[in-house]
C-alpha cells in the first residue's frame, strides 16, 4: 500500500510554483497538523466538560495562578492570543460556571477572571485523562520527544517565548523564564504525569501560535487568518481550484460548521465563490476566484521570506522536526 503524505504533497506544490522554502514549509505545516491532531485527542477528555482547547488553556492558566485569578489582559499575553479572543473564551467559561468576572481591587479599569470550584473540578478530571494517555504523543518514544522539544525550544527562544531575567543590580542574567517548564512543574505539583510528552505537546501548541503570529504580517493585508489562508491554499493547489465543502473540512481537520463559517468569510472577501455541483444537486463546491489566487500568491511570498517563523532552524533541523512529527501524523 502506498502512503501519501499530505505534507510532502503540499511541499512539492509550493516548490513547483516557485516558492523555495527549503525544509521550513514542511516543518511549519507538520507542526500545525500535529497541533490539530493533539487538539482532536484532547477533545475526548475535554468534551464531557464542554471544554474546547482554547477554553481549557485559559482555565489552566487560572488554575495554576497563585490566587486563581488574573487580569484579562495578562491572560491574553499568557495564551499568545488577541484580547478579543480571550474575551470570547472567558464569556464561554463564565456561562459554563467555570469562571467568574470580578473587579480588580486596585485598578477600576481592569477586570479579573477567577476560576470557580466547578472550574477546578473540570480541570482536575480532564488533565488526569490527558496526562495518562501521553498528551497525544504516544507514537513517539522519549528520545524523540526530547529531541523535538529541544528543536522547538530554539524557535520559541528566538521568538521571545523564553526570556532571560536579569538579577537585581545589573548582574548577569540569573534565571530563564520558560512558560512550558513552569507549566510542567505545576502539573507535577498536582500529581499529574508530565515529563517529555507533556512539555513537547505544550511546545508544539506554543510554537504553532508563534508561527501564526509570524505569518500575520503577510496575511493581514488580504484580511486572511491562518484558517482562511489554509482553506484558500487547499483550493489553490487543487486540480480545478474547487472542492466539495465536506472534502475541504477533511483536508483541514476541522468540523463542517467551521468550514462553512470560513468559506462564508472568504466569499464575502470575494476570494472564494460557491458554485453548484455539476452532478449532485445536494452538494456545493467552493471555488477560488482570481482575487483569491492573487491573495495566496502575495501572502505566500511574504511567508517564504520569513521562513514561517522558523528561520532560526537550519534545513537539517527543520527536516528533523518534520521527520519526528511524521510518526504522530501517521498514527493519527
Cite the ranges covered by each PLM segment.
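N-terminal leader segment of winged-helix/HTH proteins
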Residues: 1-49, 166-222
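Charged, amphipathic alpha-helical coiled-coil/dimerization segments
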Residues: 91-150, 263-319, 323
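Basic amphipathic alpha-helical segments that dock to polyanions
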Residues: 59, 75, 90-96, 232, ...
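N-terminal helix-turn-helix DNA-binding core of bacterial DNA-binding proteins
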Residues: 29-32, 40-82, 202-205, 214-255
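Short amphipathic alpha-helical segments with heptad-repeat character
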Residues: 28, 32, 36, 80, ...
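Exposed, interaction-prone assembly regions rather than primary DNA-binding/catalytic cores
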Residues: 144-178, 316-332
Amino acid at each position: 500500500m502506498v502512503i501519501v503524505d499530505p505534507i510532502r504533497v503540499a511541499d512539492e506544490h509550493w516548490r513547483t510554483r516557485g516558492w523555495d522554502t527549503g525544509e521550513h514549509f514542511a516543518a511549519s505545516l507538520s507542526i500545525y497538523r500535529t497541533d490539530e491532531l493533539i487538539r482532536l485527542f484532547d477533545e475526548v477528555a475535554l468534551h464531557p466538560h464542554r471544554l474546547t482547547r482554547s477554553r481549557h488553556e485559559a482555565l489552566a492558566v487560572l488554575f495554576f495562578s497563585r490566587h486563581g485569578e488574573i487580569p484579562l489582559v495578562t491572560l491574553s499575553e499568557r495564551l499568545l492570543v488577541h484580547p478579543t479572543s480571550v474575551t470570547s473564551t472567558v464569556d464561554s467559561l463564565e456561562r459554563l460556571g467555570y469562571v467568574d468576572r470580578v473587579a480588580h481591587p486596585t485598578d477600576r479599569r481592569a477586570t479579573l477572571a477567577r476560576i470557580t470550584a466547578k472550574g477546578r473540578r473540570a480541570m482536575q478530571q480532564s488533565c488526569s485523562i490527558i496526562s495518562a494517555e501521553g498528551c497525544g504523543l504516544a507514537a513517539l518514544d522519549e528520545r524523540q520527544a526530547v529531541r523535538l522539544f529541544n528543536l522547538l525550544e530554539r524557535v520559541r527562544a528566538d521568538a521571545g517565548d523564553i526570556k532571560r531575567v536579569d538579577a537585581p543590580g545589573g548582574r548577569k542574567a540569573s534565571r530563564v523564564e520558560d512558560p512550558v517548564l513552569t507549566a510542567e512543574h505545576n502539573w507535577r505539583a498536582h500529581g499529574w504525569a508530565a515529563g517529555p510528552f507533556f512539555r513537547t505537546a505544550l511546545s508544539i501548541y506554543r510554537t504553532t501560535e508563534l508561527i501564526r503570529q509570524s505569518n500575520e504580517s503577510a496575511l493581514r493585508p488580504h484580511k486572511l487568518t491562518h484558517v482562511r489562508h489554509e482553506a484558500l491554499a487547499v483550493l489553490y493547489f487543487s486540480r480545478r481550484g474547487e472542492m466539495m465543502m465536506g472534502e475541504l473540512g477533511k483536508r483541514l481537520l476541522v468540523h463542517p460548521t467551521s468550514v462553512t463559517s470560513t468559506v462564508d468569510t472568504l466569499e464575502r472577501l470575494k476570494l472564494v465563490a460557491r458554485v453548484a455541483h455539476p452532478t449532485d444537486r445536494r452538494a456545493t463546491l467552493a471555488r477560488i476566484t482570481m482575487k483569491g489566487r492573487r491573495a495566496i500568491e502575495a501572502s505566500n511570498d511574504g511567508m517564504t521570506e520569513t521562513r514561517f517563523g522558523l528561520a532560526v532552524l537550519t534545513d537539517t533541523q527543520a527536516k528533523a522536526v518534520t521527520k519526528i512529527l511524521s510518526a504522530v501524523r501517521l498514527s493519527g
